[in-house]
Design a protein with these regions (language model features):
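Short, acidic, metal-binding catalytic loop of nucleotide-sugar glycosyltransferases
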Residues: 25-34
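A conserved acidic beta->alpha catalytic loop
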Residues: 41-50
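Conserved donor NDP-sugar-binding/catalytic core segment of glycosyltransferases
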Residues: 100-136
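A recurrent flexible, glycine/aromatic-enriched loop bordering the glycosyltransferase active site
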Residues: 147-167, 233-237
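A short, conserved alpha-helix in the catalytic core of glycosyltransferases
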Residues: 165-167, 171-176, 182-209
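Non-catalytic, C-terminal membrane-associated alpha-helical segments of glycosyltransferases
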Residues: 225-339
């Protein structure tokens, strides 16, 4: 490894010019200066690329049409590294634009990596809003439960987030490319890093290598207020974290052979239960509650109105002398509505 290796920063973006600009300003404060930004602009229409070039004129821009998503964008970055014949001893850093980091971020990453070969290092995260640690970037995926558990224990980790992932170019390319058609967005990072571990690379975290994350800029997760058709469509959207097609492909690609069929059966049982049974009951329950509340309002209103009608108008006039002012106003309101 050279004494001052170059870091190639792969940054997928789409129509977040202000957020991307803030990232570039953060990047320009780095104490380590030997880096090159590869901006993968997937069809932005808000002048993101032009703004980045104003701030960082020597950046490389790869332009897409809006259909690459995360996995496809990283595949474009992968292709660029191969085409440019970037030296294997240099480094590649995958980043999200909705992150912030200290001025020694790049320097800290290189310092950690110089003692670790055949390694993928991912930045641990903290919440930009609260300032508290959140999402360590390292996970233990349990096939039995189909759940990805967060963990700081390197011995337990079997996959990583690629948000803030650092590796030598040689190690990064040795894993192979991504699967943008099979896993276009969510799960692409888990699949890639699982494959890396299977090929002998170490998955690593370090407390000195950290980023602040804006967790409000994530994909479709709250589907509770949607109609049933909207709910179905959003579940199958590429932005949906629980997209069943992406999950199926993920299981086929990375699940151990001996439990693959069983896991697929279990997964689709859960999917069908969630999409067609639980959600249907939820919608029925929601409509029942709304209709019940509406019915109660109608009944109460009817009883009140009928109650006022049962009081003779003459008696209402005599009551005015003894009824408190507040009640008189309410009685007058009812009287006006009835008559």
């Amino acid at each position: 490894m050279t004494s001052s290796p170059q870091i190639y920063i792969l940054l997928p973006v789409h129509n977040r010019c202000k957020i991307t600009s803030d990232f570039i300003k953060c990047l320009k404060k780095q104490t380590y200066r030997n880096y090159h930004l590869v901006l993968i602009d997937d069809g932005s229409t808000d002048r993101t690329s032009e703004t980045v070039l104003d701030l960082l004129p020597d950046a490389t821009i790869i332009r897409g049409k809006g259909n690459w998503w995360w996995g496809g964008s990283l595949q474009q970055g992968h292709n660029w590294l191969v085409q440019e014949r970037v030296p294997a001893e240099d480094y590649v850093l995958v980043m999200n634009d909705d992150t912030e980091f200290q001025g020694n971020f790049l320097e800290a990453g290189l310092s950690i990596m110089k003692d670790h070969r055949r390694t993928l290092l991912t930045a641990t995260g903290y919440n930009l809003t609260t300032g508290q640690p959140q999402d360590p970037g390292g996970y233990k995926f349990a096939w039995k439960d189909l759940v990805c558990y967060e963990t700081h224990d390197v011995s337990e980790i079997n996959c990583l987030s690629t948000r803030g992932m650092l590796a030598t170019v040689g190690d990064f390319l040795s894993v192979g490319g991504f699967y943008p058609r099979l896993i276009p967005h969510y799960l692409s990072d888990l699949e890639f890093t699982m494959r890396a571990q299977e090929r002998g690379l170490k998955l690593m975290l370090h407390s000195d290598f950290k980023i602040g994350i804006d967790f409000d800029k994530t994909g479709n997760r709250d589907l509770s207020n949607e109609t049933y058709i909207q709910y179905l469509l959003k579940n199958f959207s590429r932005r949906a974290a629980m997209n069943p097609i992406a999950w199926t492909n993920f299981i086929i690609l990375r699940c151990p052979k001996e439990i693959k069929v069983k896991t697929l059966f279990k997964f689709w049982t859960l999917v069908l239960n969630r999409l067609f049974f639980v959600r249907s009951l939820s919608l029925i329950g929601h409509r029942f509650i709304v209709q019940s509340i509406s019915s109660i309002k109608i009944i109460v209103s009817f009883v009140i109105r009928q109650g006022v009608r049962l009081i003779p108008f003459g008696m209402q006039q005599r009551m005015k002398k003894v009824v408190p002012a507040a009640i008189k106003r309410r009685l007058r309101k009812y009287h006006d509505n009835v008559h």
